[in-house]
Amino acid sequence: EFKNMIKFGDIIKHKNKKSLKLVNKNSEFENLAFVVDGEASITIENNVEVAKLKKGDWISEFSFITGDKTSANVISNDIFAISWSKATLQKLKIKKPELFEKLNSLIARNLCEKLIRSNKK
């Protein structure tokens, strides 16, 4: 079913020494993204990296779920991702509720995986 989600998203491809800022800290939720390949860094003040996102991870999922502002920056020099705008996700919730629920399940599973990874550090 995730394949059905792809057609509603936009492609992000970036490979450059200059980092692409995917998320700005303390911003309103704008986009949810899925890392297809590459990686991204989650950073806080003074560009201190607190975590890495890799293939299969979601970007901005906390803000998507809670509606809160973003809690960190996300930057990347090498990433291939699929991104869905807030408006697209709202339409999906109304028009394809079963697909929207699957999306929430995928995100919940990934959050658990991230928690397990962070506990192993």
Regions found by a protein language model. Give the residues of each.
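A generic structural signal for nonpolar/aromatic side chains embedded in well-ordered alpha-helices
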Residues: M5-I6, V74, L111
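Generic structural signal for well-ordered, non-membrane alpha-helices
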Residues: K7, D37, W84-A87, E113
